[in-house]
Amino acid sequence: MKIRIGHGFDVHKFGEARPLILCGVEVPYETGLVAHSDGDVVLHAISDAILGAMALGDIGKHFPDTDAAYKGADSRVLLRHCYALARAKGFELGNLDVTIIAQAPKMAPHIEDMRQVLAADLNADIADINVKATTTEKLGFTGRKEGIAVEAVVLLSRQ
């Protein structure tokens, strides 16, 4: 069995007059995230983790923000594309662990919906998908409610 581990990290600042979308789930909040795509910072970190595990670069390489084709892009489509690249090489998801770092909004009411979306998009058992949230105790840009940061770790395996 061959195993690969990938780590992804992404940050977006608040400021767009659009819905806040995290893991493909609309989270009620006063503002959305600034981004070329739909701004789903969680799916961007997960996509980077998958691409990293496969040594395929990052989402900026695959979906450049200089390409108008990706303006407002649905990050779920981007995630599924990244996972399809791994599957094409015979790899399947072992597990996914995500940490959302944000002072606001509160994530707890939305975590299970996020896990369901991820399990569906990655064709995985929900038991293999973990999403958790934390704050920085009001320190730094996330603590000042200026944006959201996300870390994602993925394990992929091939029999």
UniProtKB/Swiss-Prot annotation:
Keywords of this entry: Isoprene biosynthesis, Lyase, Metal-binding
Catalytic activity: 4-CDP-2-C-methyl-D-erythritol 2-phosphate = 2-C-methyl-D-erythritol 2,4-cyclic diphosphate + CMP
Residues marked Transition state stabilizer (site): 36, 135
Residues that bind a divalent metal cation: 10, 12, 44
GO MF annotations, alphabetized: 2-C-methyl-D-erythritol 2,4-cyclodiphosphate synthase activity; metal ion binding
Similarity comment text for this entry: Belongs to the IspF family.
Species assigned in the record: Shewanella sp. (strain ANA-3)
EC number: 4.6.1.12
Required cofactor names: a divalent metal cation
HAMAP family associated with the record: IspF
Gene3D superfamilies: 2-C-methyl-D-erythritol 2,4-cyclodiphosphate synthase
Note on cofactor: Binds 1 divalent metal cation per subunit.
Keyword Metal-binding: yes
InterPro entries attached to this UniProt entry: MECDP_synthase, MECDP_synthase_CS, MECDP_synthase_sf
Subunit structure: Homotrimer.
EC class: lyase
Protein name as annotated: 2-C-methyl-D-erythritol 2,4-cyclodiphosphate synthase
Protein purpose: Involved in the biosynthesis of isopentenyl diphosphate (IPP) and dimethylallyl diphosphate (DMAPP), two major building blocks of isoprenoid compounds. Catalyzes the conversion of 4-diphosphocytidyl-2-C-methyl-D-erythritol 2-phosphate (CDP-ME2P) to 2-C-methyl-D-erythritol 2,4-cyclodiphosphate (ME-CPP) with a corresponding release of cytidine 5-monophosphate (CMP).
